Structures are given as C-alpha cells and as structure tokens.
Amino acid sequence: MKKAMLALAATSVIALSACGTSSSDKIVTSKAGDITKDEFYEQMKTQAGKQVLNNMVMEKVLIKNYKVEDKEVDKKYDEMKKQYGDQFDTLLKQQGIKEETLKTGVRAQLAQEKAIEKTITDKELKDNYKPEIKASHILVKDEATAKKVKEELGQGKSFEELAKQYSEDTGSKEKGGDLGFFGAGKMVKEFEDAAYKLKKDEVSEPVKSQFGYHIIKVTDIKEPEKSFEQSKADIKKELVAKKSQDGEFMNDLMMKEIKKADVKVDDKDLKDLFEEKKADAKKEEKK
C-alpha cells in the first residue's frame, strides 16, 4: 500500500470529521480547557489546509473527469490487501481510515493514471520501444577529469581499471563501471540519449548530466523479444509511472484539470491556492 494513498485517504478523514458537528460543538473536553470544531478547523487549516484542500479537490476532479469501474477499484484494493496481508487492517486502524474512504482514494489514483495515459502519444510509445543495452560508465565530477579519462582510454588503458580508479559511482566502480542491462526510460535523459547512439564496444565522449560527467561504453545490445504491438501496454504502464513522478508534468496536468472543472475557493485564507499553482506553472514555462 502506497504511503501517499494512505495520506490522501487520511486527509479526507480529517476534513470529513470536521464537517460532522456544528461550529460551536466541543470535540474535546478536559480540565485544561475544551476544543471546539471551529478551533480545530482553524488549527488544521493553518498547519495543513492547503495540502488537504488540494488533495480533496484533485480527488473530486479526477473522479468526475475520468470514469473508473468498480471492478477496477476492487482489483486494486484486493492487490493492496494481499500485499500487506495481516498488517492491512492494522494500518487502516492506525490511520483512522475506513474501507470506503480508502477505496475513494484508490479510485482517484486510478483516475489520475487514466489522465496521464490520455497524454501519451503513439510517438512516445514508439520512441520508447527500444532494445535493452548493457553499458558501463565512468562518472567524474568535472569536465577536465572526464577529458583526462577519455585521453587515457585513447592511450589503450582498460575501461574497467579506469572506472575503479576514477569513478564516483560507488555502486558500479568496483565492477568496472558495469551497470547491467537497461531499457528506455531507466536512465536520465542525457545518459540514455548518448548510450543509445553508441554501437557495441563503442565509447562516448564526456556526457554531462545532473550527476556529473559520464564516459559511457556499450558492451551488449539485446533486441526486443516482443513486437511493438505486444509491448505497447507495458511501455504505457512504464511511462505512466515515470510521468507520475515528474513534478512539473503533474502540476501542469492537474492545473488543466482544475481549469476544466472551474474550481473556485470561497475560504478567504485558502482562495489563492490554485492561483499560486498557476503562477508556479507559468514560471516553469518560462525556464
């Protein structure tokens, strides 16, 4: 069970519990003083109001815009129960989440996946239908060191030995830089683009990424066993998972859904929530 799913369900529980009593009703009494619904709501709003409201609105918008069958929800829910076994009911009790609330969260998650799927083009699917390649790399911090390593390779020195000597990647350096086989979408874009241009046993020029500079060597190429048509569903699933982790993409997608739903917030303290998101999206567009 994903923690994010539990968190989404939990925020709904908090908000719903605040709606079940009148504003002056006491939800806690003690010798130290009482707590009313209004006091609780204001405190909750101050500490987590924007996040809670964002989650609740997104849940409603996604479920409204993308139809999810009950059988899809039940299947996903059963998978979660099976994954956590005997701990499942305990986790729900700890979070104060009812089955119905969690299923609503599951429905929203599946609706979000459908929203992402709708953005995936045939070109993207074809671009990600690639052979698996096996590669090694030497990762260094600066361009000067990368050029030095490339020069030493040109002098006939062993790629594996230079990886052990220079590479900053602790996970692969002792294996001579070996990264094993990987497919499309598994590496950062700069690395992947460079690696897929190489032939077997060919070595790249220094490639800059967020991690530093890479010298890449392709050591094997494995052509796909399945046809493109047979692979489409798996490729789409991987792209959905990848895009769901892309904050900029998801913010842009959700803002489009919010705009279509004509969302307006009446609470004076929270009314700018989606305006702030629109501003953030515009900043990203200008970069």
Curated annotation (Swiss-Prot):
Signal sequence bounds: 1-18
- Which reactions does this protein catalyse? [protein]-peptidylproline (omega=180) = [protein]-peptidylproline (omega=0)
Domain (PpiC) spans 130-220
The EC number of this protein is 5.2.1.8
Query: Which UniProt keywords are given for this protein, alphabetically ordered?
Result: Cell membrane, Isomerase, Lipoprotein, Membrane, Palmitate, Rotamase, Signal
Look up the record and give one Gene Ontology term from the biological process aspect. protein transport
Task: Establish whether keyword Transit peptide is in the entry.
Answer: no
One GO molecular-function entry: peptidyl-prolyl cis-trans isomerase activity
Q: Where is the lipid attached (N-palmitoyl cysteine)?
A: C19
Q: Which SUPFAM superfamilies match?
A: FKBP-like, Triger factor/SurA peptide-binding domain-like
Q: What membrane topology does the UniProt entry give?
A: Lipid-anchor
Q: Lipid (S-diacylglycerol cysteine) attached at which positions?
A: C19
* Primary site of residence: membrane
Q: Which GO terms describe its cellular component?
A: plasma membrane
Role summary: Plays a major role in protein secretion by helping the post-translocational extracellular folding of several secreted proteins. Important for the secretion of the protective antigen. The three PsrA proteins in this organism show different but overlapping substrate specificities.
User: What does the sequence similarity comment in the record state about its family?
Assistant: Belongs to the PrsA family.
Tell me the protein's name. Answer: Foldase protein PrsA 1
Source organism: Bacillus anthracis
